[in-house]
């Protein structure tokens, strides 16, 4: 997408998430903006059925896709609502190797459930 702010994010994501092609198993929806030296990303996660602060597998997939399309060879920063994550990798002969996701970890929720 061109802009992650001026978009009806939840409605757009729901139209993809609940599309008949994906509805049975469900999918996460990631929207990404190319910021030249980094990317910005928002995620709608199945199961949560709402926007989340970040998604590790989505961040990694988006960063590697960006790297492949832009011929980047070492690392990509990804800006999410939860903070900035860095994906390090090595691109060798069109294949990614040594892929690492790095960033802060913090509690965002604590709860109890009585049975």
Stretch-by-stretch model annotation:
Residues 1-54, 63-115:
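Active-site proximal loop and beta-alpha junction motif in alpha/beta enzyme cores
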Residues 57:
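Short secondary-structure boundary segments
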């Amino acid at each position: 997408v061109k802009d992650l702010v001026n978009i009806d994010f939840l409605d757009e994501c729901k139209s993809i998430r609940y599309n008949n092609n994906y509805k049975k198993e469900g999918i996460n929806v990631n929207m990404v903006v190319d910021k030249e030296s980094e990317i910005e990303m928002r995620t709608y996660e199945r199961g949560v059925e709402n926007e989340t602060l970040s998604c590790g597998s989505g961040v990694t997939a988006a960063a590697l896709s960006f790297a492949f399309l832009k011929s980047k060879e070492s690392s990509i920063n990804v800006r999410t609502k939860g903070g900035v994550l860095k994906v390090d990798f090595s691109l060798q002969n069109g294949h990614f190797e040594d892929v690492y996701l790095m960033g802060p970890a913090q509690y965002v929720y604590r709860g109890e459930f009585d049975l």
